[in-house]
Amino acid sequence: MRHSLTKLLAASGRDFPSRRDSREPPATRAPPREPSGAAAGAETPRPGSPDREQPHGDGDGGEPEARSGSRGSVAVRAPAPSPLKMEEEEEDAIAMVPKEEPEDMDFLSGLELADLLDPRQPDWHLEPGLSSPGPLSSSGGGSESGGLLRGDDDDDTAAAEMQRFSDLLQRLLNGIGGCSSGGDRGGGEKRRRKSPGAGGGGANDGNQAATKSPRKAAAAAARLNRLKKKEYVMGLESRVRGLAAENQELRAENRELGKRVQALQEESRYLRAVLANETGLARLLSRLSGVGLRLTTSLFRDSPAGDHDYALPVGKQPPEPREEDDAAGGVCLHVDKDKVSVEFCSACARKASSSLKM
């Protein structure tokens, strides 16, 4: 930014001397008057005191006469200065007094927008030997007795003015930024004043969110626990159903095995009774052999499928087993034509013993 401002000032400095020279020819340029003399001359006249003006005219009578003699020996008396002219002279004298210029934008009043935005000069480049001009006069540079004119050869003064100008622009930019930020802050304060409940509402919303967040977490944890418990109970129920079905199967098998064991116990008791009645059975069977009949038995033979097996457990629950002394030890003698078969059947033995007891 500083470089661009330097370019603008350099461009304005190119046109400024030519414009100033065109307005004021070098031949007619008057040298600057002494500040002390101008101030003294400005203080002596007063608008409403004609008595004081007369001595001033008498005292300086020799000088007008000398000037009139040099111009053509015509004696012309200088007219009395008007109050307006005297005030202008006072202002010019005060302006001619060297003083420190305020750091403001008054020295930019001589610049014109057309000079800065001239389309014929799209690019301004500083030449090696070109120096920036001094500050313009406060009166726009139109009058000969305007501001303090400085020469182009005063490079140090021009550099100091350029530094001052850049510092002033920087402060102006900082002031504009501060004003804008202050305006934003003021607008924010106004908005907060217009809506006083907005800040409290935001705080309340934050508090509510802070209080709701633990509740939400607790609710989520409770829901998760309920889901876990439900899944665990469902697993237990399915396991109980499976175990119940297996238990029923095992109970049925156990009943069948119990029946089988009971039948085997009865058969073993029957066989023990047969062995105990071996002598009587042997005599009977020996007599049958003399008749000429062939004796067979199925004791050592597997019964075919569908054949009645008296050793298998019956459907009804058998009575309590008797003691070995009361066990029936008879055999079944089957006679079919010329065939006689001896069968060992506990059921037939029980029936025979029960019929004998009757």
Curated annotation (Swiss-Prot):
Domain bZIP intervals: 208-271
Subcellular location: Nucleus
Cellular component GO terms held in the UniProt record: mitochondrion; nucleoplasm; nucleus; RNA polymerase II transcription regulator complex
MF (Gene Ontology): DNA-binding transcription factor activity; identical protein binding
Predominant place of localization: nucleus
Chain span(s) of sequence motif HCFC1-binding motif (HBM): 307-310
Listed Low complexity bias regions: 127-138, 205-218
Record region (Leucine-zipper): 236-271
Residue ranges crossing the lipid bilayer per the database entry: none
Compositionally biased region (Gly residues): 139-149, 176-185
Chain spans, region Disordered: 1-92, 119-163, 176-218
Keywords (A to Z) from UniProt: Nucleus, Phosphoprotein, Transcription, Transcription regulation
Signal sequence range: none
Subunit structure comment from the entry: Interacts with HCFC1; the interaction inhibits CREB3 transcriptional activity. Interacts with CREB3; the interaction occurs only in combination with HCFC1.
Family designation: Belongs to the bZIP family. ATF subfamily.
Full protein name: CREB/ATF bZIP transcription factor
UniProt organism field: Mus musculus
This protein's encoding gene: Crebzf
